[in-house]
């Protein structure tokens, strides 16, 4: 019995020795940063910065510090990431990172549509499957006379509008786009407006978001009989990326 116990202790001792001296040690190596700018070489590739130059744009700040604080490492000083569009596709660099697209490629997934167009329509710019990935909606703030367009909780458009006058208010509530008409006329007791472009119906009472050529009060004051007036240019931009069924929320005094 004593011999068995002695042999057991010897076996345990050998096992502990093996664990202490022969188990490989896992070392967590730091990411390679060739130029020592605080941005790893892998991240330098993602941001299209120079792995051998700690200050790619030569503005006196290292690339890592600029990226960490939300500034562009390509254009300085003082230009923030969302203000720069490295590949010129219409989607700012910050948004490219947010939507997981390539800041150096106009068409990240190579499907023939640029990244900005895909995001504005609610598609992923990095996947070719053609399925809509992101929720979209419109908000109209009557108090501020602004229209906001959101994709995946990110405000992509902030447009000045003129909503209905106090005696012909734009209705508050939750609606959706139900019809889209490139050009139409509006006729009433005291108006006859022909050739109005980019009309998006959102209420069965005949309320539209549409372009406007007869005034320039957008963002300044109310002006309409209940419709949401945009400049013709802004209405065209919104119309281009709009679809029937997109929700609209209207609020504010």
Question: For each predicted feature, which ranges?
Answer:
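Short, basic, low-complexity termini and linkers enriched in Ser/Thr/Gly/Pro
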Residues: 1-23
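Residue-level detector of high-confidence beta-strand sites
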Residues: 41, 158-160, 240
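Structural recognition of the beta-strand scaffold that forms the well-ordered cores
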Residues: 51-53, 105, 138-141, 148-150, ...
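Solvent-exposed, acidic/flexible segments
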Residues: 32, 36, 54, 58, ...
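Cell wall/extracellular polymer interaction/catalysis modules
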Residues: 108-110, 116-174
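Extracellular calcium-associated, cysteine-rich motifs in secreted modular proteins
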Residues: 28-133
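Exported/periplasmic cell-wall-interacting domains
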Residues: 130-133, 137, 168-174, 183-253
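Acidic glycine-/aspartate-rich tracts in secreted/extracellular proteins
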Residues: 72, 154, 182-184
